[in-house]
Amino acid sequence: MILNDSTIMRMVSDGLLISENFDRGCLTPNGYDLRVDAIDVEGRQYSEFEIGKNVHFLVSTIEILKIPDDVVGMIWTRSSFARKGIFGSFGAIDAGYHGNLTLSFFNAGSAVNLRRGERIAQIVFVKMIGSAEKPYHIRSGNYQNSRGIVKDPVAGSQIASEAKKN
């Protein structure tokens, strides 16, 4: 079941789904528009950048998510960016995830100016039949509690900690 706007608002009020930097103006009937925080192009970070044609770039979100153990997030590039030739590749946001997101995009079109605060992707929250037996923070937690642009697993995550032991 996809969560509607009133359910999203109620859950956000309870400290779930989007725990920091929620903006009611980004709420949609069945989801939420995620906003650009930092832009990473070739390892350098910007708050505003003209993304050229055939350029891969990363974006961190302003929003900090707190996904409950019985919800999954699904993300799509906003159609206004897709029409300009910007495409993204995203996985599901696992039940139990907490942190901001680092999203990967590619510009196949003409140069596009991108700036902090711009709405670039939509997240839809889907209620699972029940809670995950092993939510993200227990199963792996590679990017749990991430902040900013994150390319590698967050130090201190369960898998990163176990890798150091071996």
UniProtKB/Swiss-Prot annotation:
Supply the alphabetized keyword list: Hydrolase, Nucleotide metabolism, Nucleotide-binding
- Give the GO terms filed under biological process for this record: dUMP biosynthetic process; dUTP biosynthetic process
Q: What is this protein called?
A: dCTP deaminase
The cross-references to Pfam families, in alphabetical order and at most eight, read: DCD
Instruction: State the top-level EC class.
Output: hydrolase
Q: Name one GO molecular function term.
A: dCTP deaminase activity
Q: What pathway does this protein act in?
A: Pyrimidine metabolism; dUMP biosynthesis; dUMP from dCTP (dUTP route): step 1/2
- Known EC number: 3.5.4.13
InterPro entries for this protein: dCTP_deaminase (IPR011962), dUTPase-like_sf (IPR036157), dUTPase_trimeric (IPR033704)
| Subunit composition and interactions | Homotrimer.
Q: What is the lineage of its organism?
A: Archaea, Methanobacteriati, Thermoplasmatota, Thermoplasmata, Thermoplasmatales
